[in-house]
Amino acid sequence: VKAINIKNAQRVGIVYRGDDEEAKELVERYVKFLKNYKVKCKTLGYYNADELPRYVTPKLEYDYFVKKDLNWKLKTLIPEVENFIQTPFDILIDTTVKEDEVLRFIVRKSQSTFKVGAAGLKDSSDLDFTINLKEGEGLRQLMKGLDNYLHLINKN
């Protein structure tokens, strides 16, 4: 495990629920923020549906997948997900704040060197660094906490 400061990261991966408007908005904002540090970002958004909504189109930093792209063992059937898993991101941000076996599967299989996310979930042991959320806190507080600590870790 190699903990890395966000300012020193070259590549950051983010997994999130694309069908969660708050998650989508926060991830898009954070990607813009990281680009100011010249950090390359790749996000993978999951839609619990058979098809992507018409208004969703993959872009340079944004890939998506849907329920039908997985088999019953949650093994991916599309190259975008496999490429994301195989990319050794300096930091992988898991945005799940509730149990989500699909996104946790991606995090578990990821080749990233430093995986961060929320504590207290069933598979939090797959993460190298976690943030404890208080009752009623959600993704906004997780992202704020992670950003704060990722700026403090291994500060030069």
Which role does the model predict for each range below?
Residues S125-N156:
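Active-site-proximal region of nucleotide-activated glycan assembly enzymes
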Residues I14, T43-G45, G117:
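Structural beta-sheet core signal
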Residues D69-L133:
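Active-site and donor-binding regions of nucleotide-sugar-utilizing enzymes
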Residues R11, V39-K42, F114:
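Residues at the starts of beta-strands that form the adenosine-phosphate
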Residues V15-D19, Y46-Y47, T95-V97:
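Structural motif
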Residues K35-N83:
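Conserved nucleotide-cofactor-binding alpha/beta core module
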Residues V1-R11, E21-K24:
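Short N-terminal or domain-adjacent regulatory/targeting segments
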Residues D20-V39:
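Histidine-anchored nucleotide/phosphate-binding helix
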